[in-house]
Amino acid sequence: MTATKAPSEPRSQQAVRRPGDRIFAGSAKASGVFILLVLAGVAAFLVSEAVPALTAPAEDVPGGEGLGAYVAPLVLGTLLGAVLALLVATPLAVGIALYVTYYAPRRVAATMGYVIDLLAAIPSVVYGFWGLAVLAPALVPFHVWAADTLGFLSFFAGPASTSGRTMFTVGLVLAVMILPIISAISREVFSQAPALHREAALALGATRWEMIRMAVLPYGKSGVIGGAMLGLGRALGETMAVAIVLSGGAGATLNLISSSNPSTIASNIALRFPEATGLGINTLIASGLVLFVITLAVNMLARWIVNRRADFSGAN
Amino acid sequence: MTLSTRSRAVPLTMALAGTLALSACGAANESGASGGGGGGGADTQQLSGDLVGAGASSQQAAMEAWQAGFQGEYPDVDFSYDPVGSGGGREQFIAGATDFAGSDAALDDEELTAAQERCSGGEVFELPNYVSPIAVIFNLEGVDELDLQPATIAGIFTGAIANWNDPAIAADNPDATLPDQAITPVHRGDDSGTTDNFTDYLFQTAGDVWTAEPDGVWPLPGGEAANGTSGVVGVVESTAGAVTYADASRAGDLGVVSVGVGSEFVAPSAEAAAAVVENSPAVEGRGEYDFAIEVNRQTEGSGEYPIVLVSYHIGCIQYDDQAAADNVKAFMSYVISEDGQQTAADNAGNAPISESLREQAQTAVEAITAG
Amino acid sequence: MSTDTRPAAPAPVQPRGPVRVERRLPRLAPLGLYLAGVALGAGLSALTGSSLSSTVVYGVVLGTLAVFLASRLVEGRRKATDRLVTCLVTTAFGVAMVPLVSLVWTVLDNGLARFDATFFSNSMFRVVGEGGGAYHAILGTLVITALATVISVPIGLMTAIYLVEYATGRLKRAITFFVDVMTGIPSIVAGLFAFALFTLLFGNDVRLGVMGAVALSVLMIPVVVRSCEEVLKLVPNELREASFALGVPKWRTIVKVVLPTAIAGLGTGVTLAVARVVGETAPLLVTVGLITGTNLDPFDGRMATLPVFAYYQLTQPGTDTQAFLDRAWTAALVLIILVMALNVVARLISRFLAPKTGH
């Protein structure tokens, strides 16, 4: 309560402080602090379980070459898959959100938004089996083509996987999974763009795209980035779908289309944890800690990007 | 049996649970459960309470069958088995969270000491109750079976033998028409007892080709990996020229390898798997009721199939609690019974244990007491 | 794929000014041009060795190009860009529909085999091989997810309110930042955390439905906060100021003005959060365990849940593999239907509660 005594807006200082106000503000603040406590609890748990792996001699850690060598390819795999997913999903999601809010006929727009939301409702195990049974085989011709024509890029060096269960496929599966998250939030933000701005733009003779570019996109940018970050968080931490689709476990490589791919941190934990014992468990949890730190770094970067321009928000 | 009243309930949330309970009065197949158990006519003692196990997911299908049969005889026992994995199973048992563990590996010495402490300083039983042959299966047009020596199998999985028309394969299969097709070896991506047993087999029988130490995690870098038995079988089914190792019961329409044992080639079968387990030496320095074995991979015995997964049930000879002792005793004696083994085999495709193993296990089961 | 959705909805009618008369393509011309481009693309792909994917790719590219070029020549640069974007945005929507349709079809195709009365009325209690159902797992999932929602939504929503309406300075930055970090917690870690917490409190052999709810809440709260925050930020300040000017206390302004205005977005946010956790397998297995019978009391013992049920039916099938796979796919189908139903409920609630707008 005391910390909120001096809000930035002068208007709240003029309002009379009633008990209801105090209780409401207090419980809101308590919720925020509670979240910090939970997170601190999770972090403390992670660190305390990871310490044995951090201090163990290198040859005792699974793989025999120390924690760094164990985690490095996993980090690469995690970032590779998530970034690929984000690159594919973000433009598509913005497109979908724009289509639903400003292009689709009014009557069907709500239904269409609902249909895309449906993608978010599908459990990740199902995505995994769909990726394995449908998408991976369907992408095999693309893999062969990419190895033949784009082989000069290290991403497509080949040899092409015969099963299609590659980092490239995983990136696409993850993209489909985070698409509804990004598009749902973008849609929400786009539809809230002030009607006055939009109408003013149209009244000045702007085409629909110019109206969107001038009145909608600047307004919705922070929301889109926020949605993308949520999506990235999901993609970084996605476990079962990656575990089912990816043919992982190889060392660090940028090659997206061969059958030897680096695994991701989360899927590696899921695959190895049930049968792990002793230091193996500690090592896996230490890798979970690394994922935690990666998310931290990614979010710092995202904050920095968002904050470079002033927030465009109704509550400011 | 399931709507037990033993409760840690917080009054505030009772309302929620209450409304949900109102709308749901139990599954249709559960109401008549107590009337259904006619199986154990001789056993008139009524058991109740909890029986909790956790461990290897490899036993999951067999455990479903055992549970169904066991609850037919003892409808009042609250049975559950969490397929959390062997490591988790052993850990939870040692910590006293479960009554017994299912595990693809026997306890190591350190765990054994801890387990004895958990069992009031008493003995621990380890019964090899789930035996499953691991088949080398492949997807090759027009070829249903192949004879392969261990060194050839090792060569295929290391990548040294990369084509199905390799002379090493042809030498053992003069009658087969081997196509010019690249081999795609597929291995498990998860940490599994199956991989552990398979690599142990290759390490022991083809040591000069396969030099990696046996491990539950596939020890070679790269190659095609898939998650779980369903995963590897799925990839092999959809990829021409692929080969993997998996529970023999899951081979389906795929080709199956007969592996070289001594001077003959043995196909995976329940009998051959049970035979090798029976003739394998026990782990030394264990207690009276600890029947952990070292599977004899290098066997030359006729009709013995050396690539088997042996999964144990681990529990105490002496429990603190009378109900726990009675329940474990009743469950284990059902599991090792001919009926129990056959029921599991029908559902899970494992190999029923042999008569002499059963007699051996029976001594341990009879020794279970509370104290 | 994208040929059946109209690429160009009629543009807003431009007033014909006195200065100059705009040249415009006839109403149906863009659609015609687009289809012509698609046909050309199909022809081209037939020449270069036809496959469905290359037909679609060539078709969409050429169709878009045809519309753009024609508009560029007739209507000028600005209008052409507009039409190009229309094509791109529609294509994006079409592309997103492909995996959706494929997924839903796959699940329906595999899941309908066991979508029968037995599946909804029976549990797996003493079922071996064929038959059985997911009655226990469906109710278990409902109970645990509801409990997780009951925990997460108040905390998440209040935090979002705090961030948007009250917080300033360092605490605000800390909470915003760490909520984002929290989205990156791997699900298994959340499960282990809940397990460690309850083990600490109640001893080693504890397995409760509520443990699973806590684990799911750890995953759910950041999603609730993040999406609610975005939505609350969009409520125009004018509304708040108008309410303050009428002498309404701040908390009543939030409850009566801000939240109702944002209710549709809040509903979407919460539904997304539920969808995020309802299919989680790993954290539930380590905390809630797995049983074959029905247990509906989240404060007493193990429970069955749909995702765990589906996962183990899929990955550890017995010899009658098809029966296990059928149950697994049907469980997945039921899971999707559950979330869809939730979605509908959320939408109904928001429609009911949302303030009437002017148009």
What are these regions (language model features)?
Chain A
Residues 187-191, 195, 202, 271-316:
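C-terminal transmembrane helix and the adjacent membrane-cytosol boundary/short C-terminal tail
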